[in-house]
């Protein structure tokens, strides 16, 4: 059975687990965590400009949605306010695993909405066969932002070595003229004073979303040894 609106099968709709590959994330460019997952069924994003996008799973967010990195809980300030971003590095990752609903209790306690696990390539679980270099450059006009990224992985003397660096800086999100709606205040006792305040208020339009700027720098380095017994 396939839903015509969603173009997915019934089994896919009922499955609480979804895996998004690293190549799919790379095709999106520099995006927030919420925006990267926004296309998944049951997942949406609470955005604040282009840099901030907190994921919402089945209508739940904040402490009800737990963010993990390689299985370890990420502790940042994203839960303090809507204008705080999730401190995760989506540059050159392996995959993102999303578990929706009560099934997430199998992997983390105190979670009712779901969990999101970012799996990166810092610790290789298989031997690196060929040396791989990746370089990324990006610019965004809506916030005068730019981003650069670099990563390399290789096998040196039987050890798998990985290094990556990313740097992103985005200004305040531009807002088109006239897009801001003002709540008018009426004072029957002083109409003249109100008219003056009205003009001053609209003169203060700044043309951008305040506090939507962001900057992030991330460095990852890892070494692993793979053998028949596993990896370390």
Regions flagged by a language model, labelled:
Residues 1-26, 34, 62, 120:
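Short, acidic, small-residue-rich periplasmic hinge/interaction motif at the N-terminus
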Residues 2-5, 59-61, 69-71, 100, ...:
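Flexible glycine-/small-residue-rich
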Residues 6-8, 64, 74-75, 102-106, ...:
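Short beta-strands and strand-coil junctions in structured, solvent-facing domains, enriched
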Residues 17, 34-76, 94:
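Extracytoplasmic beta-strand/coil segments of soluble accessory domains associated
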Residues 48-50, 86, 109, 141-145, ...:
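Transmembrane beta-barrel outer-membrane domains
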